[in-house]
Amino acid sequence: MVVASAASPCESSALFATFDHDGDGRISAAELRLCMKTTLGEEVSDEEAGQLVASVDADGDGLLCEAEFVRLVQAAEVEEEDERRGTGLREAFGMYEMEGEGCITPTSLRRMLRRLGSDQDIDDCRAMICRFDLNGDGVLSFDEFKIMMNA
């Protein structure tokens, strides 16, 4: 869920001021919900807005001060980046997983490596898979592939 994006402290302050509709120096769940709809086009329920506020509300007053708001924005940016990275990994996994089995087999790995100009034999491919095959089934699941790509 996108909350907003602010690269600098000045942008964060300006964004906070935009979301602080009543100008009291705090953002309520209702203000957050309204601004997410009007400025970002993102519909959130009262409950979701309340959960977003609660997720960073350090003092427990049910409102966001500027520092708490900045933490919310930063968390949203990290989440968005993780989603983008996950989508890219899913696409890469799909390139290697060519047999429709939902996993990368030694054969599918070999085929893709050949397309990329690397001539590995099937035993080399088995060894590559074995290194990250956490459950020992001889193939790489998407989760194992993610671990391999982040290693």
Swiss-Prot record:
One of its GO terms (molecular function) is calcium ion binding. PROSITE patterns: EF_HAND_1, EF_HAND_2. Pfam families: EF-hand_7 (PF13499). Ca(2+) 2 binds at residues 57, 59, 61, 68. Residues 14-42, 44-79, 84-119, 120-151 form the EF-hand domain. It comes from the Eukaryota. Ca(2+) 1 binds at residues 20, 22, 24, 26, 31. InterPro entries: EF-hand-dom_pair (IPR011992), EF_Hand_1_Ca_BS (IPR018247), EF_hand_dom (IPR002048), EF_hand_pair_protein_CML-like (IPR039647). Keywords: Calcium, Metal-binding, Repeat. Ca(2+) 3 binds at residues 133, 135, 137, 144. Gene3D superfamilies: EF-hand (1.10.238.10). Potential calcium sensor. PANTHER family: EF-HAND CALCIUM-BINDING DOMAIN CONTAINING PROTEIN. This is Probable calcium-binding protein CML31. The gene is CML31.
